[in-house]
């Protein structure tokens, strides 16, 4: 994106945005990204303020244009927008993210919505504090969303990655979530059999299904993407078994997975011992999550 500012008053913001949009032609949403980058740099992240400023003919100094150019160049190289701005929107929250941590996706909000339905109903009849666990927490997106909506719940998040933990800590500690750095398959042993809900967005992608988007393929950590084994089911299988151990009788489990894994996950949940299992589909009708309950009694 070449800039040639002749006017000593600077260059009109609207013109700069138009040029940036052209420079970002290869990204999925060039105009939106151009505006979000400018809003991040100049208007405390407020896209509406940016749009108003552009409409009113506001001008940028050469220094501002140069700094903005640098951000646009990074995005044009397919660095994730969220890495550049340092934040990602997720379920009414703005989460801290960056290199080394999985960027939360909109489809995971469906998991949060379904879990909140179940937990809200359970809270009405609960005699004590609800306990919720987020396994493979990454940035802490699921745990943060649950705690923000159910502030009286006791929420735990488990994440192994050294790179992800600083982001999770920044997102979760202000909310009062208990963050544990450790293996999702062995952590929280002292809570086994006492948890009301275990939620997880584990690594699940089969090794042959490398994400098409460079943002994911090149920047999301492999340990957050690939589930292990030819079908990607190694980690989901282990997470389902661990969830069953952590849950109290009647407890709820929900896990995100690839849309090709619906049958495999349904078989897995039944084999582990879950009952009343069901898929949750995204807005395009694809099965992206599966849920089930630990039997309320040992004889069920």
Task: Tell where the protein language model's regions lie, with residue ranges.
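S-adenosylmethionine
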Residues: 149-296
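Conserved SAM-binding loop of SAM-dependent methyltransferases across substrates and taxa
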Residues: 139-151
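Conserved class I S-adenosyl-L-methionine
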Residues: 127-136
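Non-catalytic accessory regions of SAM-dependent methyltransferases
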Residues: 1-55
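Conserved AdoMet
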Residues: 39-118
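Alpha-helical elements of Rossmann-like donor-binding domains used by nucleotide-donor carbohydrate transfer enzymes
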Residues: 19, 36, 67-70, 110, ...
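Soluble or luminal CAZymes and related metallo-dependent hydrolases
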Residues: 12, 16, 63-64, 160, ...
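Glycine-rich helix-loop-beta junction characteristic of Rossmann-like nucleotide cofactor-binding loops
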Residues: 115-126, 244-245
